Every structure is written in structure tokens, then in C-alpha cells.
């Protein structure tokens, strides 16, 4: 799923991504905390003007990003 300004989030896809994150994790609590922490960072980045204007809520964006990182680790720098 590509994240863009005018993107509509498919709720079924978002639910599947969230379930996949939880299912593949060894600790549900830590995964939930990761999602919340990432969402909080995105929210503050939005306030600081570091991110483009977006209609996607920070929690939705963090689930999508973490799911992409989990499914495609070769895209990460390092």
C-alpha cells in the first residue's frame, strides 16, 4: 500500500496488516507499544511540519510502516 496525501485507507487491508504484525510478533504488548510510539512520533512530526499534510491518521500510518518493514526487511537501510 502506497501512502499518499489523497490515499483512502482500506480498512480490511489495515486490519490484516495489524493482525499480521501481532501474529508474527513474539510479544503482543511490545508490538502494541511500538505502534503507539511510532504513531506518537508521526503526530509530533506532523505538528512540527516535518511531514507532508496527510489525511492518514498517525496510528494507521504506523501500522502500515511497521507492516512494510516486517514484510520487506530488505528495503531498510543498513
From Swiss-Prot:
List the molecular function annotations (GO) for this entry.
Answer: DNA binding; DNA-directed RNA polymerase activity
Domain of life of the native organism = Bacteria
Query: Keyword annotations for this protein?
Result: DNA-directed RNA polymerase, Nucleotidyltransferase, Transcription, Transferase
Q: Which reaction does it catalyse?
A: RNA(n) + a ribonucleoside 5'-triphosphate = RNA(n+1) + diphosphate
> Which biological processes are named by the entry's GO terms?
DNA-templated transcription
Under the heading Pfam families, the entry gives: RNA_pol_Rpb6
GO CC, alphabetical: DNA-directed RNA polymerase complex
Which InterPro entries does this chain map to? Answer: DNA-dir_RNA_pol_omega, Pol_omega/Rpo6/RPB6
* Enzyme class, broadest EC rank: transferase
**Could you tell me the EC number(s) of this protein?**
2.7.7.6
Q: What does this protein do?
A: Promotes RNA polymerase assembly. Latches the N- and C-terminal regions of the beta' subunit thereby facilitating its interaction with the beta and alpha subunits.
Family, according to the entry, reads as follows: Belongs to the RNA polymerase subunit omega family.
Subunit info here reads:
In cyanobacteria the RNAP catalytic core is composed of 2 alpha, 1 beta, 1 beta', 1 gamma and 1 omega subunit. When a sigma factor is associated with the core the holoenzyme is formed, which can initiate transcription.
Query: What is the recorded name of this protein?
Result: DNA-directed RNA polymerase subunit omega
Report which gene this protein is encoded by: rpoZ
Amino acid at each position: 500500500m502506497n501512502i499518499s496525501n489523497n490515499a483512502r485507507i482500506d480498512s480490511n487491508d489495515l486490519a490484516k496488516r495489524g493482525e499480521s504484525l501481532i501474529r508474527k510478533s513474539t510479544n503482543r504488548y511490545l508490538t502494541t507499544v511500538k505502534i503507539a510510539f511510532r504513531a506518537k512520533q508521526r503526530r509530533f512530526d506532523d505538528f512540527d511540519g516535518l511531514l507532508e499534510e496527510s489525511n492518514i491518521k498517525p496510528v494507521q500510518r504506523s501500522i502500515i510502516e511497521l507492516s512494510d518493514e516486517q514484510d520487506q526487511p530488505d528495503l531498510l537501510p543498513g
